[in-house]
Amino acid sequence: EPLHYVIIKAPEDRDVMAAADVIRDAAVQLREAGIETPEHDAKLLLAEAAGVELRDVDKALLMGEELGTAEQLARFQSMLARRAKREPLQYITGHAPFRYLDLKVGPGVFIPRPETETVVQAGLDWLTRNGMIHPRVVDLCAGSGAIGLSVVSEVPGSQVWAVELSPNTAEWTRRNLSETAKKYPSIASNYHLEIADATSFATLAQLDGTVDIVITNPPYVPQTDIPEQPEVRDWDPELALYGGSMDGTLIPERIIERACRLLKPGGALVMEHDVTQGDRLVAFARATGFAAASTGQDWTGRDRYLFAVS
């Protein structure tokens, strides 16, 4: 009897590929667009589009499995196209991790950076060393709320006042406050947001001389130092980036002056700055009236923040 060959054909509507193929093709596209971490970004976007964790994507890659419905893969492709145009990953996914928080971000709000976690840690370490029970903390230039929300959620009994200049950005701060309060209900009454100019002596004037610590990440990028990365240059709000002068120290210096009045004697200022600004800002802090000032490094060993005690 003649042999019958049965050709098994996949159904026409079957446009789901193995996760490994999806990631491989996506990584090629992102690499060609100049993305430094193409595989990582592709995996994160696929996880986001499919509504799963990064480890689920890794498992699918390892096991040769498929991942995501046709609809989810279509969403992935549109996210991929945005990333290939160098839109920041966090704006596409709509959130950014920071310490123990997952913060909502989007166009108009500065994306919190890992190095700022070091700045927060330096402030928390100081509070711990000094046995502060119910510290009064100020976060100037709040942005997404990363610094102040980390403090209020990690330090029981802390009172945080946050100042943000842009009403548009403050919407993101508020959103992150309500999201964080779902996880840490006690913080709602301990976090106070003010839409105001952080460099003005009128802002939070009622707190002058009573604050334990100011932790801040002000705009500090030198005007001469336009960021090379399109993600930063073309997407981060300029208001949150540039320090207002050629060397970028104008706004940081005004923040030092403001912090000096806010702090009680022996209070501390921890302020992020550019790698080039350490010596100048230490000298400025001392000239402004701080008793001690030094430069702290981030986890890469780069000069990253001013630490000053009033």
Question: Where are the predicted features?
Answer:
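Short, low-complexity intrinsically disordered segments enriched in A/P/G/S/L with frequent Arg
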Residues: 1-3, 135
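Non-catalytic accessory regions of SAM-dependent methyltransferases
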Residues: 4-62
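Conserved hydrophobic residues forming the short capping helix/wall of the S-adenosyl-L-methionine
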Residues: 30, 127, 177, 181, ...
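Conserved AdoMet
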Residues: 39, 47-125
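Hydrophobic beta-strand segment of the Class I
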Residues: 45, 214-217, 233
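Conserved SAM/SAH cofactor-binding pocket of Class I
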Residues: 115-227, 254
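Mobile active-site "lid"/loop adjacent to the S-adenosyl-L-methionine
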Residues: 219-251
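Conserved Class I SAM-dependent methyltransferase catalytic core
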Residues: 245-308
